[in-house]
Amino acid sequence: MTAEIQSAYLAPEGLNEPLLKEIEGVISVQDRLILSSQPFINTYWAQNIWKNPKIIHIDSINDAAKKLESNQRNWCLYSFILHRRAKLIEEKLNSRKPKLLTFPTSLSGDPLGSWCLLDENTILASADCTSPFPNGKPSFIEDKSGPPNRAYLKLYEALTLAEKLSLIHI
């Protein structure tokens, strides 16, 4: 299975089915992560797409961190199995910690890769992902006492992504 993976798609919470209808060559579904034997395509329902993921065989937690950091600096974990081992690897990485965003904001130019454990000694990692946010989910500072409220958070996300796509200038 691992040699065939050419792309991976992270579905939003509860939306695996619409995403599965868009993707061909599905190898397996791991929680919200859908693995495909086909090169990546842009989809409507993916929260994040892992372009050209690589299989990395590891011997230890330290070995995993070294191999990930040799590919790039910033990584985001998507954990669906072996949560404790994955967290230990994540702690060894020198990745920048995601911070809450204020609106309006410009997105960082630093690329953010995504990775997961497929089993105890195998990592699936992609240094090239479609979303600049950890697991495709932005975290804006929320004003809990007055406007703006939670409804504005989706608007903030949409406008921030529109700026990334050069559709608007904030």
Model segments located where?
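SAM-dependent transferase fold signal centered on methyltransferase-like domains
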Residues: 1-168
